[in-house]
A protein has these predicted regions:
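Acidic, metal/ion-coordinating pockets
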Residues: 19-286
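N-terminal signal peptide c-region/cleavage motif recognized by signal peptidases
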Residues: 14-16
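Positively charged n-region of N-terminal signal peptides that target proteins for export
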Residues: 1-5
Length: 286
């Protein structure tokens, strides 16, 4: 199988919360499947193999306490297709799990590419795989039970939030729910997270403009607002290119904003889309 993984740039930030306890979170950008990738993974009738896509970085992913990526495809079943209406083979999810990913973000502009059936099938496969997720839900009851997504590991409690700017004009079919960027909803979710006294609230935002190497005004304003409401760190996706990062300090507090991690697995050919970041966030307690 021909490997179509992107070039990876590795960055490490250590953010001190207060060193008796420590947790390492690893974030990657867009996990995509264009048609050339699907074709390259095809090994026999009805069978696909993606293991080589992650072979060079599997060890690094697995070393993190938590590895998180943006699943920017549906697992909507056959026929498998790339852009513009993504539906990846089920084997792709298994390869993602085998690579060491623990959590996938599902609120993005392609999560409804296969409509209600595709979104629900994606959720079903995530549930059966044991990979946790945030961003899309079969109904309101499931969202209330599962969101915000709380992670309890190494003595830490972390709340994970995920929202998207839109879904390419396709609307979620009731009772399905997609987390759209809406300040009223986000504020309620932040307050719900705060009530459980997490050590950190991390907002993963699918935002910005595609192929732009700088964040736009809306991204910057929303980032400021999120921090003001109590979000600790912000991780961005969607532009398919790397955008700047910021480390902000407020007294003894430190806040990371990653405006865009770029692509992680893709077959894009536009300028600057062939690079992405592995972002490692280390939190410590004294």
């Amino acid at each position: 199988m021909k490997t179509l993984a992107v070039f990876i740039v590795v960055l490490l930030y250590s953010v001190t919360l207060s060193s008796q306890e420590r947790i390492t979170l690893l974030f990657v950008g867009d996990l995509m499947q264009h048609q050339a990738q699907i074709d390259a993974a095809h090994v026999s009738e009805g069978k696909y193999d993606y293991s080589s896509c992650f072979s060079l970085i599997k060890e690094q992913i697995s070393q993190a306490d938590l590895a998180i990526g943006n699943l920017e495809v549906t697992l909507g079943g056959r026929p498998y297709r790339g852009y513009p209406m993504f539906s990846a083979p089920d084997e792709y999810l298994q390869a993602i799990k085998d690579a060491g990913f623990d959590i996938l973000l599902t609120a993005n502009n392609h999560c409804l590419d296969r409509g209600k059936k595709g979104m629900e099938r994606t959720i079903q496969l995530l549930d059966s795989s044991g990979i946790r997720y945030a961003g899309t839900y079969k109904n309101l009851s499931e969202r209330r039970q599962r969101y915000p997504l709380f992670i309890n590991r190494n003595g830490f409690r972390i709340a994970l939030l995920n929202y998207t700017y839109g879904t390419n004009g396709i609307k979620a079919t009731s009772p399905n729910i997609v987390n759209y960027i809406d300040k009223n909803t986000i504020l309620q979710d932040i307050q719900s997270a705060k009530a459980r006294q997490p050590d950190a609230i991390i907002a993963c935002m699918h935002w910005g403009e595609e192929y732009q190497s700088l964040p736009n005004r809306e991204q910057r304003e929303l980032a400021n607002w999120l921090l003001q409401q109590g979000v600790t760190h912000i991780i961005g996706s969607h532009p398919h290119v790397i955008q700047p990062m910021e480390l902000r300090t407020n007294g003894t507090e430190q806040h990371i904003i990653v405006y865009s991690l770029g692509n992680f697995i893709s077959n894009m050919s536009k300028a600057n889309t062939d690079g992405g970041l592995i972002f490692t966030l280390q939190l410590e307690k004294h």
